[in-house]
Each structure stands twice: as structure tokens, then as C-alpha cells.
């Protein structure tokens, strides 16, 4: 067997490198009708589905949705989460801003993406497109505001919408005059409040005076009962003392008679 050809191995490796580089270069660009249209990165960040002059739809990858719903996007770190949310909102605002620009781009007809694909994530808190028509709120705890179109306002349906909408029912033009009280009603309510306060104070004072009188009567009654009990106790003690003295005299007389008999 002969020696292996190192030159042929080097040529094969060089050929493989060239093939890989060509494949990488071809993957970075998307060819539309034989002309280099846009890179893959531009397609990812583009807000439009671009149509050719013959109105043939050009396929576009759902890279935005993949970025929005990727598991690495919902990271445990709060800082990364906030950064990713800001980045995604920046892309959505870019879509809205491009929609307002004049649609004249070198003969190509830019068309906005469908509502389903433009909305990044239906379950996301930062979704710009919702079924109820509410726009993105910077403070999630704040109530969502509903905006009515200019056509309805011009047609005079603003009052009807305010009446049907419970959020703006208290601020409607018809009920605004009824909600604002007049000076006379304010004065009458103030006078009635003052009169009620005075009557309450008088009732409290009468109750306090009645309690004081009752306490005084109870105290006088208690002192009279105590005095009577002391008097009764003194009488009993004096009678006991008198009875004891009488018994002593009788005992003395008995002792004297016994002594006389013994003699």
C-alpha cells in the first residue's frame, strides 16, 4: 500500500470549508425572485409581510412569536424580565410607527401582519392588542381605559356610549349638573347638621345630670341604712351590758346566803 496523500486530504478539507461558508452566507440572505431581498435578521425585526409587484405573498418566519414565547424570555431574574419586556414593547411600538409612515417603498407593497401574529402573546400582561380594545397600560394596577372612535363622537353617539359604559356613567354630561349641589342645598344641609349636633349635645347633658342625681340619691340612702344599723347594734350592746350587771348582783346575793348558812 502506498502512502496517504496529504495533498488530497488538505484539498478535501479546504473544499469542505468553502462549502460550509457558502451555506452560511446563503442562510443569512433570503432570495426573492432571484434578487437578494433581506437578511434573516431584518426579516425577524420587520413588522410587515412584503408583497411583490405581482402581489405574490412572500413567506416570512414567525421569529417574533418564537422570541415572544421562548422559555428563555421568561427568566427568573427580575432585571432580565424587565429588559425583555421593554425590548418586546419597543418592537411593537416600531410596528405601530411604521404603520403610520407613507407606504411607498420602491414599488413594493407593505402590508401589516395579521392581528394574531402582530399580537405577541395572548396571555401576556403587556399585550398591545386585546379583544376589549384596551391599550397597553404602564401601571398594571390602573383600570383600563376604553377609547371611542371619532366617527361615533361625530355622529353624536358619545352620550349613548357614556350611558352604557359603567366606567363613565358618573361623568356623563347629563348627570353632571345633577351631581353638583347648589349653594342653597349646601346651606340647608349645613344648618340641619348643626341642629342635629346641638340636639345630641343637649341629650348627652340631660343624661349626665340624671346619672349624677341618681348617684347622689343612692349615696344618701346607703348612709341612712348604715346609721340605722349602727344604732340598732348600740342598743343591743347596752341591753346585754345591763343584763350582765343584773346577773352579777344575783350571784353576789347567792354567795352571801351560802356563806351565812355555812357559818
UniProtKB/Swiss-Prot annotation:
Residues 30-85, 102-140, 154-195 form a propeptide. Bag cell neurons. One of its GO terms (cellular component) is extracellular region. Residues 154-180 are annotated as: Disordered. This is ELH type 1. The modification Lysine amide is found at residue 233. Keywords: Amidation, Cleavage on pair of basic residues, Hormone, Neuropeptide, Secreted, Signal. It comes from Aplysia parvula.
Amino acid at each position: 500500500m502506498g502512502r496517504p496523500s496529504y495533498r488530497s486530504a488538505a484539498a478535501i478539507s479546504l473544499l469542505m470549508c468553502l462549502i460550509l461558508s457558502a451555506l452560511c452566507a446563503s442562510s443569512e440572505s433570503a432570495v426573492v425572485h432571484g434578487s437578494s431581498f433581506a437578511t434573516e435578521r431584518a426579516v425577524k425585526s420587520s413588522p410587515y409581510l412584503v408583497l411583490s409587484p405581482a402581489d405574490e405573498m412572500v413567506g416570512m418566519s414567525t421569529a417574533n412569536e418564537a422570541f415572544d414565547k421562548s422559555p428563555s424570555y421568561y427568566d427568573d431574574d427580575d432585571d432580565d424580565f424587565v429588559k425583555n419586556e421593554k425590548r418586546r414593547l419597543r418592537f411593537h411600538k416600531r410596528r405601530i410607527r411604521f404603520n403610520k409612515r407613507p407606504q411607498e417603498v420602491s414599488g413594493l407593497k407593505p402590508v401589516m401582519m395579521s392581528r394574531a401574529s402582530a399580537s405577541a402573546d395572548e396571555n401576556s400582561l403587556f399585550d398591545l392588542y386585546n379583544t376589549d380594545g384596551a391599550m397597553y397600560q404602564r401601571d398594571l394596577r390602573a383600570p383600563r381605559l376604553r377609547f371611542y372612535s371619532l366617527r361615533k363622537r361625530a355622529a353624536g353617539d358619545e352620550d349613548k356610549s357614556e350611558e352604557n359604559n359603567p366606567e363613565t356613567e358618573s361623568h356623563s354630561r347629563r348627570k353632571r349638573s345633577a351631581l353638583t349641589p347648589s349653594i342653597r342645598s349646601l346651606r340647608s344641609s349645613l344648618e340641619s347638621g348643626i341642629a342635629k349636633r346641638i340636639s345630641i349635645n343637649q341629650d348627652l347633658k340631660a343624661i349626665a345630670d340624671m346619672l349624677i342625681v341618681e348617684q347622689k340619691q343612692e349615696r344618701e340612702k346607703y348612709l341612712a341604712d348604715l346609721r340605722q344599723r349602727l344604732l340598732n347594734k348600740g342598743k343591743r350592746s347596752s341591753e346585754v351590758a345591763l343584763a350582765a350587771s343584773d346577773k352579777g348582783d344575783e350571784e353576789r346575793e347567792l354567795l352571801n346566803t351560802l356563806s351565812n348558812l355555812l357559818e
